[in-house]
Amino acid sequence: MLEIKDLCKRYVDKQALDHVSLTVGPGEIVGLFGENGAGKTTLKKCILSLIRYDSGSVTLDGAAFTRANIGRFSFATCEHSFFPALSAQAHREFYEEHFETFLSRRFEGLMEFFGLPMDKPIRSFSTGQKNQFEVIMALSQGADYILMDEPFAGNDVFNREDFYKVLLGILEPHETVILSTHLIEEVTGFIGRAVLLHEGKIVGDAQTAALDEQGLTLMEYVKQTFSYQSDRVSKALAELTGREDDDA
């Protein structure tokens, strides 16, 4: 069980996280949503101890993070955490040496699924391929908690859609995913829980099954929570063109 209690993080001129509390259990697939600067990436980096938070706590099964349990987490980020001069095969050998839980069969299957070469340096990959490889490594580490930050930036809609189908098929019951993306509609059928962040605060937390029972789509829930103004496009067009747009 991952428990985040009263977490605060401030940068010089901005409160990035403002008393965030969140509990995520084994096997959950959680979507973390919010506008740019809402605190999504900061929260994940605080969970992983990549940056220091000012106050609050992050525990795993009631214990503080140490070198002994940090390996239960993996992180796929579009900032890229791999060794660009090394090949995929070299990465595999490195991970097999350092992570007893490394899932070689999953690694091979995902590399084949995405059609990525094993023998070329990662720096020769396109941006989309680099993001694919980042996700492959995160999923193959054998971690219990897999954090993803805009995992498929630079990939086409077909790759993204197929990946989510594959991911649902390969995840084990104990594997937990915390995923942030702006492509809300694409992950609607994938996630089981939606957590909404706004200005460093959690402003919404709902099970997607409960939203279905209420007759709400995930996008409708997000718009409702953030008080989305449905007429903002028509107002902008009227201001920009000097005429009303009845179809906006």
Regions from the PLM with identified roles:
Residues 33-35:
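The feature captures the beta-strand-to-loop junction immediately N-terminal to the Walker
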